[in-house]
Amino acid sequence: RPDGEAIDLDAYLRFATDRHAGVQGDASRLYRQMRSGARDLACLLLADLSLSTDTWIDDRGRVIDAIRDSLFLFGESLAATGDRFAMLGFSSRRRDPVRVHQIKTFAEPYGAVIRGRIQAIKPGYYTRLGAGIRHAAQRLAREGASRRLLLILTDGKPNDLDRYEGRWGIEDTRHAVGEARRQGLEPFCVTIDPEGNDYLPHLFGSGGYVVIRHPAELPARLPLLYARLTAGG
């Protein structure tokens, strides 16, 4: 209802994705009565910004453009719903340094400064996914929420210059995911790699990932996926 005390998460996310796609959504059902107590939830979104994201999807844009739009819509949606969240980007060139782009901390409000950081992201280097997950998990583990979701957005397999491709990268990433779970975190991977089903079950388990086969759909689907993952939380 339009004058409710709390925004309806599912309704708002659908409204926001429709608006992003140029469809005029119905704002009349966005609100609902606030449940007793706020959601005790924290989410950290970790985005792969490696050079492979410079690949063109079609004549309308590149993978990095879909990632940028996803971060914009994700940020707008979660800021409106009131859930606590942070956003990081990462890429790598061998073990050190792993480049970490601080897009939004948990303490920062979502606004013009954060939008500017999202706009400024650029692809570069490689995907040392295990290191990225460990860094993000360390930050998320500091949060005191009862549910802590680590949402990982990537476009392909772990890879780097120092033989990190293949079994080494896969096993390092699997160990990083296990370490995160032992800290009480909930890692979940969102990939646009059409071959993701070949290796992601080994890394995240059968229910720990989703493959989005059309990269252009990523901005609209990511907030809705978040709503499903956090339903009731």
Pin down the residues of each PLM region.
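Negatively charged sequence features
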Residues: 1-44, 49-56, 84
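VWA/integrin I-like adhesion module and closely mimicked acidic/polar interface patches used
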Residues: 137, 156-201
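Von Willebrand factor
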Residues: 95-99, 103-148, 190-198
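…and closely analogous acidic/polar surface helices at protein-protein or active-site interfaces
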Residues: 41, 53-85, 136, 170
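Flexible, glycine/threonine-enriched loop-and-boundary segments that flank and lead into catalytic domains
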Residues: 10-33, 71, 121-122, 132-137, ...
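Glycine- and acidic
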Residues: 50-61, 115-122
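C-terminal helix of von Willebrand factor
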Residues: 206-233
